[in-house]
Design a protein with these regions (language model features):
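Helix-to-loop junction immediately C-terminal to a conserved catalytic motif
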Residues: 50
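Short coil-to-beta microelement around the adenine-binding A-loop and adjacent beta1/P-loop entry
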Residues: 16-17, 82
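The feature captures the beta-strand-to-loop junction immediately N-terminal to the Walker
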Residues: 35-37
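Conserved structural motif at the start of ABC-family nucleotide-binding domains
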Residues: 4, 19-21, 85
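Conserved coupling/switch loops of ABC nucleotide-binding domains, chiefly the family-specific signature
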Residues: 56-59, 63
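Conserved ABC ATPase "signature" region
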Residues: 65-71, 108, 112-148
Length: 151
C-alpha cells in the first residue's frame, strides 16, 4: 500500500496544459525529488498536491483514502476540499517569515486565512481566532519556542 498515490493529475490554465497525466506512488519513508526546468510545472504539481490549486483531472489518495477526485469536486470552495487543505503544508526552498509579524502571527497566518471560508466565520470570528491562536501557542511550545510567542 502506497502512502501517497497520485494518478493521472492534469492541470490546465486556459488552453495551456501544464500537467498531463502525472502519476506516481510514494511509499512511507521514501523521498521523491521533482526536477525540471523553469516553467515545467513543478510548483503547480506541489500546489495541486496540497490543494492550493485544483487539478482538472486525476485522483490523490493518502493511505488508500481518496482525498481528491477531480470528477467529484464542485468548486474551489467545496467544504471537504477546504478541510483537506488544513492537513497539508509546503516547506519552501527559501524559508522566510514575515518580519513584521510575531512568531505566533507567522504560525497562525495560514489557518486564519482558511478560517475566513468557514460558514459561521462572521458570527464567530473572535472565538475562531482564539482557538487558532491557542493551537499556534501549542505548536510553538512543541518546538521549544513558547517564550518567543510575541517576538
Amino acid at each position: 500500500m502506497a502512502m501517497l498515490e497520485v494518478k493521472n493529475i492534469e492541470k490546465h490554465f486556459g488552453s495551456t496544459d501544464v500537467l498531463k497525466n502525472i502519476s506516481f506512488d510514494l511509499e512511507e519513508g521514501q523521498t521523491l525529488a521533482i526536477i525540471g526546468s523553469s516553467g515545467s510545472g513543478k510548483t503547480t504539481l506541489l500546489r495541486c498536491l496540497n490543494f492550493l490549486e485544483i487539478p482538472n483531472g486525476g485522483t490523490i489518495a493518502v493511505n488508500d483514502e481518496i482525498l481528491f477526485d477531480a470528477s467529484q469536486i464542485k468548486s474551489k470552495k467545496d467544504k471537504d476540499l477546504r478541510d483537506k487543505r488544513l492537513h497539508f503544508g509546503m516547506v519552501f526552498q527559501s524559508f522566510n517569515l514575515f518580519p513584521q509579524y510575531t512568531a505566533l502571527e507567522n504560525v497562525t497566518l495560514a489557518e486564519k486565512m482558511l478560517a475566513k471560508d468557514l460558514p459561521d466565520f462572521k458570527q464567530n470570528k473572535k472565538e475562531i481566532y482564539n482557538k487558532i491562536e491557542e493551537h499556534g501557542k501549542e505548536l510553538l511550545a512543541r518546538m521549544g519556542l513558547a517564550d518567543r510567542v510575541n517576538h
